[in-house]
Regions:
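Conserved actuator
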Residues: 1-14, 28-31, 159-171, 270, ...
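Actuator/coupling domain of P-type ATPases
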Residues: 1-72, 363-369
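Conserved ATP-binding TGD loop and adjacent catalytic N/P-domain core of P-type ATPases
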Residues: 7, 16, 27, 105, ...
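Conserved cytosolic headpiece of P-type ATPases
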Residues: 12-16, 20, 83-97, 124, ...
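Conserved catalytic phosphorylation-site environment of P-type ATPases
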Residues: 34, 69, 82-156, 304, ...
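Helix-interface capping motifs at the ends of transmembrane segments in multi-pass membrane proteins
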Residues: 40-78, 102, 375-401
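P-type ATPase nucleotide-binding
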Residues: 135, 139-263, 273, 285-301
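Membrane-embedded transport module
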Residues: 344, 349-424
Length: 424
C-alpha cells in the first residue's frame, strides 16, 4: 500500500481548525472590552474601600488588628477573578461548541455579532438547494443539434465551479462530448460567461438577456419555474437548458428553527423570480427576491442594516461575495468559491443551512452566558464587599467565597457544551 502526504500537519484541515480556534479564542469581543474598562475602575475603588474600612473600623473599634482583618477581607473577597473570567470563559466554551459543529468564527467579535442577528438572508442555488441540478428540459434553436449546444456550453463552463456549470459538464460527458478549447474569457457577475470557442465563435452562456435573445413564449411547464441557462454564438441563439434542483434535506427544518426563535429569514437569488418563488413557497418564506445581481444583493443587505437590523448572509458563490462582505455577519458554505470563503466572517464546514441555524443559536447562547456571568460577578461583589467591611466575613471565608464565584462563572460557561448538544 502506498500513501502520499499532500500537506504538513499545520496545513491540514485539522490544523486549520485548531489555528482558527486559537486565533478566535485569543480575540476579544466588544462586551469583553466593556468588562476590562469596568475592572480598570473597580480595582482602585476596592482599594479605596479597603482603606476606608480600615480607618472606620479602627476609629470605632479602637483595634488596629480588627481593622486590618476587615480590610484584608474586603481585598480578598473583591478580587476581580470572576469578572475577568466572565467573558473569556464563555467565549472559549462557545467557540469550542461551534467548532464541534463544524462552524468557524474568525474571531470573538464575529461571534458576538452573530448572537445579535435578527435577520438572515439566504442564497438559493447551492445554499438552500442541494447544488446538484439535473437537466430537466432542452430547447434547441432551428438548425442546432444537442452536440453543438453542449460543445459550446461545456467549452465556456469547463473552468467554472457553479452548480449549473457542473451540471452542463456532466451532461456533456454523458453524451460523450469533450469541451473544445476556449480563449479570451470574460465574466459578468450575475449574468453569465463568454469566450472564443474554437470552431464555433464568440459563445455566451448565462441569462437569456446576457446571451441576446428571449426564450420562445410557448415554452411551458418546467420552463416557468426552472433555472435556465441560455447559449448563443456570435449573437445568435443556439438553445437553452432548464435545470431542476432539489432542496437540501435540512433546509426546511433549519428555516423553521430560525423562525421559531424570532429570526426573519429571507431569500435573495440571481435566479428567475418564478424559480425563486417556487422554493420560497416550499420553505414558507414570505420574503424572497429573484433576478438579483451581486450588487443588488449587497445593496439590499445594506438597506436592511440601515433599518436597524442585524443581518447575517449565507451563500457559496462568487455572486454572493459582495453581500457576504456587506452583512454584519457573512457565512460561507465550505466547498463554494474561494472568493465567497474569503469574503465571509464565518465558515460552515458541512455546507448546510442546518449548520447556520446551529451557529446562530450557539452564538445567542454564548452572548446570554456572558451577560449571566457578568451579572453573577457584579452581584457577588455588591453582596460580599459590605459583609466583609462589617466583619461578617473573615479573610478565610472571603477567600472561599471569591473562589466559589469564579467556579460559578466557569460552571455556567461550561453549560454551553451541553446546550450545543441539546439544540444542535
Amino acid at each position: 500500500v502506498e500513501y502520499r502526504a499532500e500537506a504538513l500537519g499545520g496545513d491540514t484541515l485539522l490544523g486549520d481548525m485548531m489555528r482558527a480556534l486559537s486565533e478566535a479564542q485569543g480575540s476579544k469581543a466588544p462586551i469583553a472590552r466593556l468588562a476590562d474598562k469596568v475592572a480598570a475602575v473597580f480595582v482602585p475603588v476596592v482599594l479605596a474601600l479597603a482603606l476606608l474600612t480600615f480607618a472606620l473600623t479602627w476609629l470605632f473599634s479602637g483595634s488596629p488588628v480588627t481593622a486590618l482583618v476587615h480590610a484584608v477581607a474586603v481585598l480578598v473577597v473583591a478580587c476581580p477573578c470572576a469578572l475577568g473570567l466572565a467573558t473569556p470563559a464563555a467565549i472559549m466554551a462557545g467557540m469550542g461548541a461551534a467548532i464541534g459543529r463544524g462552524v468557524w468564527f474568525k474571531n470573538a467579535t464575529v461571534m458576538e455579532r452573530a448572537g445579535r442577528v435578527d435577520t438572515v438572508v439566504l442564497d438559493k442555488t447551492g445554499t438552500l438547494t442541494a447544488g446538484r441540478p439535473q437537466i430537466a428540459a432542452l430547447w434547441l434553436a432551428e438548425g442546432v443539434d444537442e452536440t453543438l449546444l453542449f460543445q459550446a456550453a461545456s467549452a465556456i463552463e469547463q473552468h467554472s465551479r457553479h452548480p449549473l456549470a457542473q451540471a452542463l459538464l456532466a451532461a456533456a460527458a454523458e453524451r460523450g462530448i469533450s469541451p473544445p478549447p476556449a480563449s479570451a474569457p470574460y465574466s459578468e457577475a450575475g449574468a453569465g460567461l463568454e469566450a472564443d470557442v474554437a470552431g464555433i465563435g464568440r459563445v455566451r452562456v448565462g441569462k437569456p438577456e446576457f446571451c441576446g435573445f428571449r426564450l420562445p413564449e410557448n415554452l411551458e411547464g418546467i420552463w416557468q419555474i426552472a433555472s435556465v441557462a441560455a447559449v448563443s454564438a456570435d449573437g445568435k441563439a443556439l438553445g437553452a437548458v432548464a435545470f431542476a434542483d432539489t432542496l437540501r434535506p435540512d433546509s426546511a427544518a433549519a428555516v423553521a428553527r430560525l423562525q421559531a426563535v424570532g429570526i426573519e429569514v429571507r431569500m435573495m437569488s440571481g435566479d428567475r423570480p418564478a424559480a425563486v418563488a417556487q422554493i420560497a413557497t416550499e420553505l414558507g418564506l414570505a420574503a424572497a427576491q429573484g433576478a438579483m445581481s451581486p450588487r443588488d444583493k449587497a445593496e439590499a443587505v445594506r438597506q436592511l442594516m440601515a433599518q436597524g437590523r442585524v443581518v447575517a448572509m449565507a451563500g457559496d458563490g462568487i455572486n454572493d461575495a459582495p453581500a457576504l462582505a456587506a452583512a454584519d455577519v457573512g457565512f460561507a458554505l465550505k466547498g463554494g468559491t474561494d472568493v465567497a470563503e474569503h469574503s465571509a466572517d464565518a465558515l460552515l464546514m458541512n455546507g448546510s443551512v442546518g449548520q447556520l441555524a446551529d451557529a446562530l443559536l450557539v452564538a445567542r447562547a454564548t452572548l446570554k452566558t456572558i451577560r449571566q456571568n457578568l451579572f453573577f460577578a457584579f452581584f457577588y461583589n455588591v453582596l460580599a464587599i459590605p459583609l466583609a467591611a462589617f466583619g461578617l466575613l473573615s479573610p478565610v471565608i472571603a477567600g472561599a467565597a471569591m473562589a466559589l464565584s469564579s467556579v460559578t462563572v466557569l460552571g455556567n460557561a461550561l453549560r454551553l457544551k451541553h446546550f450545543a448538544q441539546r439544540v444542535c
